[in-house]
């Protein structure tokens, strides 16, 4: 059973201009004391075509975390416009909030994001080169996609290294085809659909 549960996530300052920081108010609960840090990340999916355009906007270490309920506001600067392909600047993309413990991701919350011009004239006749200063960002806050991953909460780095060293190199060297990485926004939100749910 997961030792950390996200109880609520609120998207703040939404909708807003594209260059405004992302802000999420996160409430989570630990069922017991965690001796190590939780690492939270905000990741902006720059293009559905390739993960190379993903931008980690910020990461923060929280911990050690005592048992109980906790709340914090996680803020990150807007993505670097120069790293977003022109063809993906306007339209729908995804922002991800992930959390890991001892290097293992155990939860991922994804939101669809719609970037569009606030000026009706620009919406009707968009310029060839995106004008990020004219874009408005609207996060679909009412429908997050939550994916949970099973991890070893007790694992130490030494034990993990032993496990890696004791693996038979001939076995499990390649992922089966159904585990191969896939591209697209749906892939970013649906890593393990059987372990996910549509809302918190």
Curated annotation (Swiss-Prot):
InterPro entries (alphabetical): ASF1-like (IPR006818), ASF1-like_sf (IPR036747)
Record carries keyword Transcription regulation: yes
GO cellular component: chromatin; nucleus
Main localization of the protein described in the UniProt heading: nucleus
UniProt organism field: Xenopus laevis
Record-given protein name: Histone chaperone asf1a-B
Pfam families: ASF1_hist_chap
Quaternary state and interactors: Interacts with histone H3 (including both histone H3.1 and H3.3) and histone H4.
Protein localization: Nucleus
Family from the record: Belongs to the ASF1 family.
Gene3D superfamilies documented for this protein: Histone chaperone ASF1-like
GO molecular function, one term: histone binding
Free-text function comment from the UniProt entry: Histone chaperone that facilitates histone deposition and histone exchange and removal during nucleosome assembly and disassembly.
Keyword terms, alphabetized: Chaperone, Chromatin regulator, Nucleus, Transcription, Transcription regulation
Entry annotated with the keyword Transcription regulation: yes
Disulfides per UniProt: none
Taxon lineage: Eukaryota, Metazoa, Chordata, Craniata, Vertebrata
GO terms under biological process: DNA replication-dependent chromatin assembly
